[in-house]
């Protein structure tokens, strides 16, 4: 019987700033990116907040962290700190 090789997609890695660290083992990370406006061609800063799993409560507000996609940990957490 032949073994099938599954091709796995690499998980997305983002860099952002911790904006909230009030919950246990959870931080909120804001990721900023620059995009060009389709009509006006102006560079615009877009931001998105991600709820991230922080196993050892290491990070505080203002820290710069890298986060990686993960299987769902809770209803809103789908990212972990690298």
Curated annotation (Swiss-Prot):
Gene3D superfamilies: Nucleic acid-binding proteins (2.40.50.140)
GO CC list: cytosolic small ribosomal subunit
This protein's UniProt keywords: Ribonucleoprotein, Ribosomal protein, RNA-binding, rRNA-binding
Residue spans crossing the bilayer: none
GO terms, biological process: translation
GO molecular function annotation: rRNA binding; structural constituent of ribosome
CDD domains (UniProt xref): Ribosomal_uS17 (cd00364)
Function of the protein: One of the primary rRNA binding proteins, it binds specifically to the 5'-end of 16S ribosomal RNA.
Membership in a protein family: Belongs to the universal ribosomal protein uS17 family.
Record note on quaternary structure: Part of the 30S ribosomal subunit.
Protein name: Small ribosomal subunit protein uS17
């Amino acid at each position: 019987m032949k073994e099938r090789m599954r091709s796995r997609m690499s998980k997305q890695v983002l860099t952002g700033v911790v904006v909230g660290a009030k919950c246990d083992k959870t931080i909120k990370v804001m990721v900023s990116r620059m995009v060009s406006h389709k009509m006006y061609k102006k560079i615009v800063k877009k931001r998105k907040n991600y709820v991230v799993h922080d196993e050892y409560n290491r990070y505080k507000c203002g820290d710069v962290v890298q986060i990686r996609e993960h299987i769902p940990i809770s209803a809103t957490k789908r990212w972990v700190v690298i």
